Amino acid sequence: MIITIDGPAGAGKSTAARMLAERLGFEFLDTGAMYRAVAWACVARNVDLNDAAAVSETAASISIQFEVERIICNGQDVTTEIRSAEASHAASIVAAVPGVRLEMVRLQRESASGHNYVTEGRDQGSEVFPDARCKFFLTA
């Protein structure tokens, strides 16, 4: 079963999703962390963030795994690094790249397939998981 939580920045999506997942015994899919991991990989590889092809190629070439309270990118725990101001800024740039978006949507769907997930983030209920059983939209 998939439960999605959408809404604007600062609405409390991540907090609500984490709490709901814990309460239901579901896994939590932090989609923002996925974009941050792509941004981190781009910065670590000195990829020009204005080069959409290179950014998309980076997104397609990395491995992103979720473990309990940790984000693993290419075998490295990047949980702390992806929360930096630099990664946040870079994430907003890479998230606007269509190739990155396609790859992240593919990965989100693949990750959730056959699992019970609470997922939050941009367009989760409308685009990523349009057939989700429960969809919420939070406002600040």
Question: Each predicted region: which residue ranges?
Answer:
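Conserved lysine of the Walker
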Residues: 13
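ATP-dependent small-molecule kinase phosphotransfer cores
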Residues: 33-117, 123-128
